[in-house]
Curated annotation (Swiss-Prot):
Subunit structure comment from the entry: Homodimer.
Annotated protein name in UniProt: Adenylosuccinate synthetase
Cofactor(s) this protein requires: Mg(2+)
One example of a Gene Ontology biological process annotation: IMP metabolic process
Intracellular or extracellular location(s): Cytoplasm
Gene label: purA
Residues where IMP binds: D13, E14, G15, K16, N38, A39, G40, H41, T127, R141, Q222, T237, R301
Primary role: Plays an important role in the de novo pathway of purine nucleotide biosynthesis. Catalyzes the first committed step in the biosynthesis of AMP from IMP.
Binding site for GTP: 12-18, 40-42, 303, 329-331, 411-413
Catalytic activity: IMP + L-aspartate + GTP = N(6)-(1,2-dicarboxyethyl)-AMP + GDP + phosphate + 2 H(+)
Source species of the chain: Levilactobacillus brevis (strain ATCC 367 / BCRC 12310 / CIP 105137 / JCM 1170 / LMG 11437 / NCIMB 947 / NCTC 947)
Binding site for Mg(2+): D13, G40
């Protein structure tokens, strides 16, 4: 038995989908444990590019089981669209399993998300997908789960009760039109019936696989710095992308987690508002954004760009228990005369090495950089660190030293062949 968790160790968009897809080759089960359709991942399979939001990357392998765990908030409409998209492109989905305990995103969640964000003076940068309101209902114990969605009478009763309260908020607080009960019930009950064949107790599926000695890969969404507890609160998501979220969001005990792979870029990116100490506002930032095609998979918003921040990565290592790193997008830095790594912050005249919780302190933090010479050589063909130009080797090795975690995979381009194994996590 072996289990590996793939987590984003920055602010999301680190290339987790590609790494998960790469590690899926030796996995028997691939499971999502949190988030919803607010974060997309891009996978290149058989020369074709696929963009998924809910379905795990393992769906492309017919001999593997793909799981949407109980910690995910699920929009049935988005999921049906994604399944149709895969079917239209010749991808079978018989290997998908959906937790009966996952909570369902309904139209009032999306409308409330939009209305709340519009009303705020300070924007969090929501994707308007209803994720936050769905998790709020879950915490308030009024959420509707997949198991409820499949039961005609229970769904009818819960939806009726919820809609009374939601329409009060929508109409009286946000001056929105009320939602129609019959329209929602008919549409979403029908969607639930379309998904019924995929629904099961996924905790049993995953634990049975582990007990049988199979390899299980857990796939997170977003990143550690967007974690509701350990991220840049309140500019965070509504769930726990950290590795600890696996136990809650998939129904697997912590003693069954063996490895945690932290995925990161060779620089840093962020979508939406919030602290970003190493952010670049110059031509170098623009160059990295365009070279790296740094635009959101779901939102299409241009991502904010900054230098690699080892303070952030050490924070991710500590709170998520990273055992190895997966370094992506090294090729994007090719051609820069100088590359920088943030090794610490200056705060009120003091050098600090840990990420502050206070937004006031974060705004006052000035990055302390190490400057290293860049490289001009094409590295997209390199298949090991030893094949990299000397300056690129120095950069990679220094990143690992500052973070204190070994690099297990190194990517020098978007294709699978450009992802190089330096250490096999399944045999570690």
């Amino acid at each position: 038995m072996s289990s590996t968790v793939v987590v984003g160790s920055q602010w999301g968009d680190e290339g987790k989908g590609k790494i998960t897809d790469f590690l899926s080759e030796k996995a028997d089960v691939i499971a999502r444990y949190q988030g919803g359709d607010n974060a997309g991942h891009t996978i290149v399979f058989n020369g074709q590019t696929f963009k998924l939001r809910l379905i795990p990357s393992g769906i492309f392998y017919a001999d593997k089981t793909s799981v949407i765990g109980n910690g995910v908030v699920l929009n049935p409409q988005s999921l049906i669209e994604e399944l149709t998209y895969l079917h239209d492109n010749g991808v079978a989905t018989d290997n998908l399993r959906i937790s009966d305990r996952a909570h369902v995103i309904l139209p009032y969640h999306i409308l409330l998300d939009q209305a709340q964000e519009k009303a705020k003076a300070s924007k969090i940068g929501t994707t308007n997908k209803g994720i936050g309101p769905a998790y709020m209902d879950k915490a308030e114990r009024i959420g509707i789960r997949v198991a409820d969605l499949l039961d005609h009478d229970i769904f009818a009763e819960k939806l009726h009760q919820n809609l009374i309260e939601k329409n009060k908020v929508l109409t009286k607080l946000y001056d929105e039109e009320p939602l129609n009960y019959d329209d929602i019930f008919e549409t979403y009950y029908a969607l639930g019936q379309q998904l019924k064949g995929y629904v099961t107790d996924t905790s049993v599926v995953i634990n049975d696989a582990l007990d049988a000695g199979k390899n299980v890969l857990f796939e997170g969404a977003q990143g550690v710095m967007l974690d509701i507890d350990h991220g840049t609160y309140p500019f965070v998501t509504s769930s726990n992308p950290v590795a600890g979220g696996v136990t809650i969001g998939s129904g697997v005990g912590p003693t069954k987690i063996d490895h945690v792979v932290g995925v990161c870029k060779a620089y840093t990116s962020r979508v939406g508002d919030g602290p970003f100490p190493t952010e670049l506002f110059d031509e170098i930032g623009d160059t990295i954004r365009e070279t790296g095609h740094e635009y959101g998979t779901v939102t299409k918003r241009p991502r904010r760009i900054g230098w690699f921040d080892s303070v952030v990565l050490r924070h991710a290592k500590r709170v998520s228990g990273l055992t190895t790193l997966s370094l992506n997008c090294l090729d994007v830095l090719t051609g820069l005369k100088t590359v920088k790594i943030c090794k610490a912050y200056q705060l009120n005249g003091e050098t600090i090495y840990h990420y502050p919780a206070s937004l006031v302190d974060l705004d006052a933090c000035q990055p302390v950089y190490e400057e290293l010479p860049g490289w001009d050589e094409d590295i997209t063909h390199c298949r090991s660190v030893a094949e990299l130009p000397a300056n690129a080797q120095t950069y990679v090795k220094r990143l690992a030293e500052l973070v204190g975690v070994e690099i297990a995979t190194l990517s020098v381009g978007p294709d699978r062949e450009q992802t190089n194994i330096l250490q096999d996590v399944w045999n570690a």
